[in-house]
Amino acid sequence: RTYTLSKMERTVEAHPDADVCTDITCCQAYIDPADAAANWGENAQTYTDKIAAAVADTDGMAALFQGQPIQAVFFSSAAGRTVDAVEVWGNAVPYLTSVDSPEGDEVPNYHSTVTVPLDEFKSKLLAQYPQADLSGEPAGWFANLVPNSAGGVETVDIGGTTVGGGSLRTLFGLRSTSFTVSASADGVTFSVTGYGHGVGMSQYGAN
């Protein structure tokens, strides 16, 4: 509710005639009740009742900061800490700072691995960072990893060019910016922890 209210207060260029869209990269992921129930299987009624109770118990309520609806952003799971909003979106938000969010292997999709063939890695990276020098042994391409507030990747030098962890996440479909990277003749492998942009509330952490 609060998230929707905050969206209603500003116009989005991608959909000027609507307050909220169902594009996960823009506004809000959406699934209709029937499809959600199918995904939940035998837990469908329990989860449906839980959602209905949460809506009813907070009827008419919203979270405000300085009189305005907060940006009630959330994501799936954190790698031990959430990320400061300024590191992801460039704007400092007093209530969206990095905090502990202890989670573990019991969380679905907590660990994932993405291996990118060398030719594909070179093609995608050089399309965005043509100045990168990807000659020599692949293991030598990576240096100077700078951590963010959650211990993930803020930036890393690749072929002598500084690349943001968020850019790598987008380019190679990583689940988060909390990753380690290794490279060999077989390709570049990202070992990823957590799922999502990392800002705000971790759903599994809250659970």
Predicted regions and their residues:
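Conserved, single-site charged/polar hotspot
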Residues: 1-207
